[in-house]
Design a protein with these regions (language model features):
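Outer-membrane beta-barrel "beta-signal"
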Residues: 27-29, 184, 212-224
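Residue-level signature of outer-membrane beta-barrel architecture
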Residues: 72-74, 126-128, 143, 184-186, ...
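Extracellular/periplasm-exposed beta-strand and loop segments of Gram-negative cell-envelope proteins
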Residues: 38-63, 91-118, 144-175, 179, ...
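Transmembrane beta-strands of outer-membrane beta-barrel pores
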Residues: 34-38, 88-92, 130-132, 141-145, ...
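Membrane-embedded beta-strand positions in outer-membrane beta-barrel channels/transporters
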Residues: 29, 67-69, 81, 121-123, ...
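Outer-membrane beta-barrel channels and translocator barrels
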Residues: 21-23, 77, 89, 130-133, ...
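Repeated loop/turn-to-beta-strand initiation elements of outer-membrane beta-barrel proteins
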Residues: 80-82, 132-135, 189-194
């Protein structure tokens, strides 16, 4: 995976260098937005089975996070460009549980677990621009900076447990994904985009569990 990361950086440098020796001029931009992330694979299927057994007492939801960073847009033709970038991205997964047994529901017993992982994402996109409308796809290489697991439990409105654990060592530090999406760019350089990341690398550091990152990103950016 480290080799793939170096390849991604080499592509970024090569595309910008290529533009400098042709008549095209690269533009640079910044982009930020929201991420809705989750997991897929055997681990997700096992969790779904647990949810069915719990009959609604446990619910899951995608983790909502934030991403921000910069990119270079390097024209190849009038309609096609390469866009390498580097972004800070928050990903993860949320799990909520409640005890609603008849006669003791007034106790308000509940538990929550939230996994928040912070990554550095390096996408290298091939982008097609048609009168402002954009279609793009390409590989993305990511490095896990930190994974934090927060668990809480409560009863009668009181917090009985509030634990934060550094879970970084439990996860693969390197991740690879395929990303693609659509967007629109205004004449002023302001652009909007929606994309989907499909993880290809196992999240488990020991590679025992088949769990992979998935994420939907909605972003707003501007090019200079």
């Amino acid at each position: 995976m480290k080799k793939q990361f170096l390849i991604a950086l080499s592509i970024c440098v090569s595309t910008i260098s290529f533009a400098q020796i042709t008549s095209t001029t690269p533009t640079f931009g910044v982009r930020a937005g929201l991420i809705s992330s989750g997991i897929r694979g055997d681990a997700s299927n096992n969790l779904d089975n647990l949810l069915s057994f719990a009959n609604g007492a446990i619910t899951t939801s995608n983790h909502t996070g934030f991403f921000a960073g910069g990119y270079a847009n390097v024209p190849v033709t009038d309609m096609v460009s390469l866009e390498p970038g580097i972004f800070y991205a928050e990903k993860g997964y949320d799990l909520n549980g409640s005890l609603n047994i008849k006669g003791v529901g007034f106790l308000g017993a509940n538990a929550k677990a939230k996994l928040q992982s912070t990554y550095i994402d390096i996408p290298v996109l091939l982008k097609v621009n048609i009168s402002g409308f954009q279609i793009f796809a390409g590989p993305q290489f990511s490095y896990l900076m930190k994974a934090n697991l927060n668990t809480t439990a409560g009863l009668l409105g009181f917090n009985l447990l509030n634990s934060n654990m550094d879970a970084t060592q439990q996860f693969n530090r390197w991740d690879a994904a395929v990303t693609g999406g659509i967007g629109y760019k205004l004449g002023s350089g302001i652009n909007i985009s929606a994309s989907y990341d499909y993880g290809l690398s196992k999240l488990d550091a020991n590679k025992n569990a088949n769990a992979y990152n998935n994420a939907i990103k909605l972003g707003v950016g501007i090019e200079f």
